[in-house]
Structure formats: C-alpha cells, structure tokens
Amino acid sequence: MPRKIESLFLAGPAGRLEALLEEPDQAAVGIALVCHPHPQHGGTMHNKVVFRVAKGLRRSGHVVMRFNYRGVNLSEGAYAHGEGELDDARVALDVLLSRYPALPLTLAGFSFGSRIALRMGCAPGGLAPRRVIAVGFPTVYKDRAFLDNCGVPRVFIQSTRDQYGPVEELQPLVDALPEPKQLIWIDAQDHFFAGALEQLEESVIRLG
C-alpha cells in the first residue's frame, strides 16, 4: 500500500504556508518537523538534503512534516530575517502536535533550518522534544546564545568539507556545549553533502 502523503496549507502569521505531511509505512514511533535552508538562497522544503533527512526519519517510523517558510513557492508573505521564519516553524509544529499529541517529537533542520530547529527545541517553555537533529549547522552566524544551557539532546550531522561550518569551527563549538550531544561527521564534498546523500539518510535512520 502506498504511503500517505498529504499536501496542506497552514494558517501562518503572514498568510498561508505550504506544507507536506508524510506517514511511515509502519506504525509510527514518533513525529518530526524538518526545517529547510535559507529562503533567500534557494532553500525550500524540496531541497535534496531536507528530502533525505525527511526520508530517513520516515523510514525509521516517523510521521514527517516539511513546510515552506513565508514567501517560498506557494507560501504567502515575505522573508522576515529569521524571526518570522521561526514563527512559521512554530505554526507548523503546532499543527503537527495537534494531530499526533501522543507521539515523541524530533525537530530537524538543514543549514539555516538547523538554527530554526535548535532555537525552537532549546527555548524555555516546556516543549521538551526527544531531540534536535541539526544538519549542516552554519558557524558563519555568530549569534548562538540559544545553544547555551540547552539540555535537549542535540545531534549534529556535518559534512567534513562544509564551507559554512568547517571542522575547525564546528568541532570546538560542539565540544563546548553541555550534554547530551552527538556530532556525526560524513565524508562529503560540500555543505550540501554532495556524493554522500545516501550516507546522510542512513545516518538519520540509525538514530532511530
């Protein structure tokens, strides 16, 4: 039987938001929200890295929601410097939680989206996700106060040749963070995991 894929429009703060909801082939063990990269640099929910992360989560038994930030493809509104995009992600998360309130939550994101996921997951207020998966975390952004004193389990997955989050910058950053945390390096050609997308997907599956 083909898996269920539902196309949605969510009521976002700047207009409707385009989203996709995918259920796993097996009984669901959790839910996951996946945030895409920077909307002003071609980022969409159909980005190949986002797709692979979402696929890995679905294959490991998660109901997965992807969405487009305001102003991307069929989502209404305009870029809002990260703050509006964070609000968009919260709307998508609320919809996901309302549909599956009893399942444990994973937040995930790629590049700019990894910051959005971490900001949501590490914010005070009782969200308490099972974990946050930060793929291709960009160290070029220096405002990282949201990582301080974050007790949520965080998994960083990074290309060994990431030009926006190189080894020599990300390794000490993660080393300095409080537990629980994990850093997975993948031998890929660039920030977008060229030549290693299958390994990325398998790494997500192994997280369970």
Identify what each model region corresponds to.
Residues 150-151, 155-158, 162:
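Short beta-strand/loop motif that positions the catalytic acidic residue
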Residues 152, 165-174:
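Short alpha-helix in the alpha/beta-hydrolase fold that links the catalytic acid
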Residues 194-207:
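Post-His helix in hydrolase/transferase enzymes
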